[in-house]
UniProtKB/Swiss-Prot annotation:
It comes from Microcystis aeruginosa (strain NIES-843 / IAM M-2473). One of its GO terms (biological process) is photosynthesis. NCBIfam families: PRK00704.1-3. Its main location: membrane. This is Photosystem I reaction center subunit XI. It holds the Pfam family PsaL.
Amino acid sequence: MAETGYKQVVTPYNDDPFIGHLATPISASGFTKAFIGNLPAYRPGLAPILRGLEVGMAHGYFLGGPWVVLGPLRDSEYANIGGLIPALAMVLLATGCLASYGLVSFQGKAASNDPLKSAEGWSQFAAGFFIGGMGGAFVAYFLLENLGVVDGIMRGVFNQ
């Protein structure tokens, strides 16, 4: 049979099909590894409170959007505040879950070199998450409430 010249893109890890490793061109690429390595959970030398702050800001910022667009107040003038309040509630609930996870999982364990493997580290992470999440939700609310002004600034309307 003639060879078609087709090159298989997804191959077994180290050309051994019995290893069971699912390396794909996407998951094994340098870009993906660099992107995942720069997430706050994997960035070395970052204090737990700063990790929590960064994760919280991102979550607080995007949590309000679904309630603004799809919530029960979506067609009213109160849609933005109707997105802010549930986002704040979700951040508060997630903070409680993070804090209780840290208390339950690391109760009575010896101190570790990794700060996120201790109850104190998780407490700091949860505190940072709370501050960042609340701040992110309020920033998203502010931007939605003042969308006309922000749009004018971005378009350069006020600089003419």
